[in-house]
Amino acid sequence: MGSEAAAAARAVVVAVNGERYEAVGVDPSTTLLEFLRTRTPVRGPKLGCGEGGCGACVVVVSKYDAVADEVTEFSASSCLTLLGSLHHCAVTTSEGIGNSRDGFHAVQRRLSGFHASQCGFCTPGMCMSIYSALAKADKASGRPAPPTGFSKITAAEAEKAVSGNLCRCTGYRPIVDACKSFAADVDLEDLGLNAFWKKGVDDEHADINKLPAYSGGAAVCTFPEFLKSEIRSSMGQANGDTSAVVVTGDGWFHPKSVEEFHRLFDSNLFDERSVKIVASNTGSGVYKDQDLHDKYINISQIPELSAINRSSKGVEIGAVVSISQAIDILSDGGAVFRKIADHLSKVASPFVRNTATIGGNIIMAQRLSFSSDIATVLLAAGSTVTIQVAAKRMCITLEEFLKQPPCDSRTLLVSISIPDWGSDDGITFQTFRAAPRPLGNAVSYVNSAFLARSSVDGSSGSHLIEDVCLAFGPFGAKHAIRAREVEKFLKGKLVSAPVILEAVRLLKGVVSPAEGTTHPEYRVSLAVSYLFKFLSSLTNGLDEPENANVPNGSFTNGTANGIVDSSPEKHSNVDSSYLPIKSRQEMVFSDEYRPIGKPIEKTGAELQASGEAVYVDDISAPKDCLYGAFIYSTHPHAHIKGVNFRSSLASQKVITVITLKDIPTNGKNIGSCSPMLGDEALFVDPVSEFAGQNIGVVIAETQKYAYMAAKQSVIEYSTENLQPPILTVEDAVQHNSYFQVPPFLAPTPIGEFNQAMSEADHKIIDGEVKLESQYYFYMETQTALAIPDEDNCITLYVSAQLPEITQNTVARCLGIPYHNVRIITRRVGGGFGGKAMKAIHVATACAVAAFKLRRPVRMYLDRKTDMIMAGGRHPMKVKYSVGFKSDGKITGLHVDLRINCGISPDCSPALPVAIVGALKKYNWGALSFDIKLCKTNVSSKSAMRAPGDAQGSFIAEAIVEHIASTLSVDTNAIRRKNLHDFESLKVFYGNSAGDPSTYSLVTIFDKLASSPEYQQRAAVVEHFNAGSRWKKRGISCVPITYDVRLRPSPGKVSIMNDGSIAVEVGGVEIGQGLWTKVKQMTAFALGQLCDDGGEGLLDKVRVIQADTLSMIQGGFTGGSTTSETSCEAVRKSCAALVERLKPIKEKAGTLPWKSLIAQASMASVKLTEHAYWTPDPTFTSYLNYGAAISEVEVDVLTGETTILRSDLVYDCGQSLNPAVDLGQVEGAFVQGIGFFTNEEYTTNSDGLVINDGTWTYKIPTVDTIPKQFNVELINSARDHKRVLSSKASGEPPLLLASSVHCAMREAIRAARKEFAGAGGSSLTFQMDVPATMPIVKELCGLDVVERDLESFAAKA
């Protein structure tokens, strides 16, 4: 080993965007992302999750094969890829394919032009996923050359290119359009609103020549020549080297054979506890490293492990072959191989599959009980594995391997062999998986794979099973298993209903989830469903086919009512989950206030796509910067007796721990404060009050060291003399634990409820519904950088929606004047309310550490900590009593509402008025309520997009649907009957109702729900359900009313001597397009001084970052009205400037802008103006209206829901920027889909969040949005009291997503009706939020298969 030790100082050499970098003295555990962001100027790749689950960090990695003289390139997660494994590789980031200096790439320009970037944090990763998919398609052989300007990629491939990338802002539709614009098989006219041609205008036709030019990947060199030369040179040197091990960097070893691996591992160089064996390291996304490792053995360069051997017997795949490579290999094989490849393509995401290895997946399943799809599928296919332990090599079945005790690090998986089942017509091979996402990164609840050899019985047409293999995956067992008892039973049987029924009964005894498994009954039901589907396919008549003549009213062409006409296509057997995404946008453009009203691109979108846009964590670390990570309590109510650290490499990196004692003497222990709602503690003092509460901040030299050290903390708790924690609303009620609602925030009841109930023909007493929480999942986690300054001053760069309150809190905590604290926020990588009060804690903790240590301190929360501490949306329990007439007219409603607010008030006292405000969209006759804010020992809940309104609107729909079900009438009839007329609207909403001409809800609702198109679609749904047993559809139309408040707002406009313009506003750019609208307003307001009406000024305007020492009384960014109020403040500033400049303009006549400003400057005209706009006291709020129709398809066997189509009509007033408002509508709607359907926020018995990462918390992805997504923005009427007659768009459209939940209820009702004859359940049922797959399946019936089979068997 002498030569290896001597070589240990060799540098890892990589090329980054064509530049050479040597990594010397780098921690061997350094990831590529960490290296890029700390050792290079690159900032495009972002840390979004650290799990390979979000795509924010995606880069393209290129490798050079000097022997073949070939470069291969693929996308990869830089957060998982270790730098030490990339010696002599090239890395290309978003900056490398295009930037502001060298010119933007077509991908970047199209993402910008299709309005596909909002907060922009995810955009560089999106960009590289798309770029990689284009490069792969264009290099593929056998594909025809595409027309000029297009790629070889297909529209279907383009959609899947970003299937693993998360975006919380856009709703994905514009991203999909940008992707598909490269595909030659797409109709450009079908693409959505963009900046390249004006849709809906006769002389503006879609044309490839109008799109930014694309000429393949030739313009970007991903592998520089100098690196090729180095590789060739190193090969020559290696030929004379007797060592079989290559050593790079500090602690990286690359054995070249299996034998050398064992010799190396058994040497005295390694301590098994600190060495890590890696091939791709993607497993660390699932099983996080709990400590640092100082040595790594990279087995990916062992040729035998990457070999692929084909023969007549099958294919042998080396253990380090990537999943993507395996898919490519198997796709060229027989039917069984192709089916395996198809299933593997649904595992992980493209950028993970490109590096994750087949062997690594199997090893995790065997050693760590990983929920592997691959193990299940290969098990059913009869695969064997070759393993080597020391000098002993053996070939055993995969089943035997999985059953063995967990293998140790010395056991090397060499290869996996899959037999070739040939073209035997008697072989049937099927695979199944149920996961929250069809294509995205989601572990399945259950997966299964079945292989049978059978022959057809001539008399019955059913199959005689000769042999069968039934494999089932992660249902709560340690690993995939074969259902041997069931297999034994089935062999020799002719498949029939009685046989399947008995097989199902046997299976339920085999599939037994371990204790503690989530949704155990659902998982068993899934296993039964999959066996049923498989065996039914081998019968004649039992597996009832979908009616091939049932029309599909969801995917249509043409327009009707401003949406889409319903020329029905024929329903096919294509899985609706994989239908292509279609869309249409309708809106009215106005030139009245140009450039206000133009759908211009979002300011900075191209910079966001290239990765040049600077977020807080992109700011270069100051000299001597330290890094912090929270140590938090895992107990909800306990004395903190002490904090220690385990003896580990990570704990050795701790510099200090900042705690309560480090707050200055004159300071206070506050982590957030509100003059009206109270304070929340920054540190535990001395009793933890909830799981997730901050105990202290670990300080270390790097962010990774801080993260890892925090994991090594050991907290000593004591619950002596403490009461049990209050965790639920039921606990709070029992202990009378409540916060008070200030009188000025309390909603007002309407009418006399008791009298209203006495007038009712029917009554529902104590109806109930529950709504759970939702996590923000902004792509950029909480982050701050604190830099101490002279004279006890401090500057903080914070990702915050409340810079002013952050300043106040930091100052109070440190005991210094407010003017000593400067908060700067340029842009926020997603907020949704989560960067409001919750961001203050991080900033304040950072400030305390920096103030104490007199050094800069930076904190960037890891995703798990962020999710645990964030709080999220308020969960609540609702009970209601409602009276109504026989015709459906409601007479009175009383609601008992218990809201889980957490440990502090935060924004909770403002929730009741919001809930009631959204609830009042219907005329309830009389409305009363009893709302309690429950104080509990959980992290305080905070504002999340449409806080309270989202729940209130849904509660109204749940009640209306209950009434409709009770009366057995169409729900829309109840909705329409109880919509307000203007008189009742005024009673319920007062001044917010505005003028009669602005009340557009009835018109909108009738446009959708009363249209012939809707009636036809409803009939199609009913017809479909009559012909489909195992898939049911539902359609629903939901109206919304949303009350928004106008707030005072400052604005400042400064004209420079060259005519360029700097604008400051109190609001923060969080992706909502604030800067864009402000630019347009500035140009409009100053436009009367210009001959072109101000359009030429757009490029001269720059909106600068929020700075609390420059712009005081900035208020907060939230409530959906920040953009319009900021615009009005700017307009007011501009008006003053215009008055000063007008005399010069009038005197000179025609005068270019630059000359006008030059003359004004010479004349000493003041060229800056600060204004503070306040709303008219008689008009401080207004109502927003909209409605949505959603149509869904529910798989009765699995609970999976596909949103076939959503049609949204939203009254946006006279839009300040239709492109921005459209993006807000679509993004809010999709975020709402997550809340109502799929985002499962789960805690343990101590209230600690356990769905704490991308592996367990599933926000919507490109494959879960509506397959047809139509949006119409309407302008109901002028209203001079609003800002240029505009309306808010950020939050109200989220409420429309309840239409999906309501449509799901209709589909479930159809399923329950279908099986009513077999002991089905009531057609009136409670359906809580979110309606996840397990909930949907349970409501459809966990035992529908058994009941159906019993029915068939009885007829046999």
Swiss-Prot record:
Residue span, FAD-binding PCMH-type domain: 245-437
A biological process term (GO) from this entry: abscisic acid biosynthetic process
Keyword Metal-binding: yes
Disordered, as annotated region: 552-576
Enzyme Commission (EC) number: 1.2.3.1
Cofactor binding, note field: Binds 2 [2Fe-2S] clusters. Binds 1 Mo-molybdopterin (Mo-MPT) cofactor per subunit.
Molecular function terms, GO-annotated: 2 iron, 2 sulfur cluster binding; aldehyde oxidase activity; FAD binding; iron ion binding; oxidoreductase activity
Top-rank taxon, per record: Eukaryota
Binding locations of [2Fe-2S] cluster: 49, 54, 57, 79
Domain 2Fe-2S ferredoxin-type: 10-97
A UniProt-annotated Pfam family: FAD_binding_5
InterPro entries for the chain: 2Fe-2S-bd (IPR002888), 2Fe-2S-bd_dom_sf (IPR036884), 2Fe-2S_ferredoxin-like_sf (IPR036010), 2Fe-2S_ferredoxin-type (IPR001041), 2Fe2S_fd_BS (IPR006058), Ald_Oxase/Xan_DH_a/b (IPR000674), Ald_Oxase/Xan_DH_a/b_sf (IPR036856), Ald_Oxase/xanthine_DH-like (IPR016208)
Enzyme class: oxidoreductase
Cofactors: [2Fe-2S] cluster; FAD; Mo-molybdopterin
Keyword terms of this UniProt record: 2Fe-2S, Abscisic acid biosynthesis, Auxin biosynthesis, FAD, Flavoprotein, Iron, Iron-sulfur, Metal-binding, Molybdenum, NAD, Oxidoreductase
Known catalytic reactions: an aldehyde + O2 + H2O = a carboxylate + H2O2 + H(+)
SUBUNIT field: Aldehyde oxidases (AO) are homodimers and heterodimers of AO subunits.
PANTHER family: ALDEHYDE OXIDASE 1-RELATED, XANTHINE DEHYDROGENASE
Family: Belongs to the xanthine dehydrogenase family.
Name of the protein in its database record: Probable aldehyde oxidase 3
Organism placement in taxonomy: Eukaryota, Viridiplantae, Streptophyta, Embryophyta, Tracheophyta
